[in-house]
């Protein structure tokens, strides 16, 4: 069985920057490789670190980790499929808390393409 990308109800994609498309591609390829679904829990919606937060620019996405068999393996697969680790990164944010998730974004201070 092949995994797919799902979206939590209410998540918005008001804008998707070129870097955002690359992130979505990496998440999609990771889900397919893992053989289980990955759920995006935040796009351009929600409260983040301010108006210039990469989420609001369509350059960052959060992926649910609580329901994954091994979040570290999912993270590794997303990182494996990112085209350029010099300009993109992903990590497990707030590990061990109710807010734990995989955060993926265009690196701060970089431009893609």
Region locations from a protein language model:
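Catalytic cores and adjacent binding grooves of peptidoglycan-active enzymes
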Residues: 10-18, 48-113
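N-terminal, Lys/Arg- and Ser/Thr-rich interaction peptides
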Residues: 1-10
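Extended, low-complexity, intrinsically disordered C-terminal regulatory tails
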Residues: 18-52
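A generic short-segment signal for beta-strand/edge and adjacent turn/coil regions
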Residues: 8-9, 26-35, 69-75
């Amino acid at each position: 069985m092949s995994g797919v990308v799902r979206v939590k109800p209410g998540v918005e994609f008001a804008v998707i920057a070129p870097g955002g498309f690359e992130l979505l591609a990496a998440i999609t390829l990771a889900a397919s490789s893992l053989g289980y679904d990955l759920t995006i829990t935040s796009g351009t919606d929600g409260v983040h670190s301010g108006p210039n937060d990469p989420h609001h620019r369509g350059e960052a996405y959060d992926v649910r980790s609580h329901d994954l068999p091994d979040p570290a393996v999912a993270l590794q697969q997303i990182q494996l499929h990112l085209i350029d680790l010099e300009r993109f990164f992903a990590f497990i944010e707030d590990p061990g808390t109710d807010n734990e998730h995989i955060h993926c974004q265009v690196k701060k201070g970089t431009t893609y393409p």
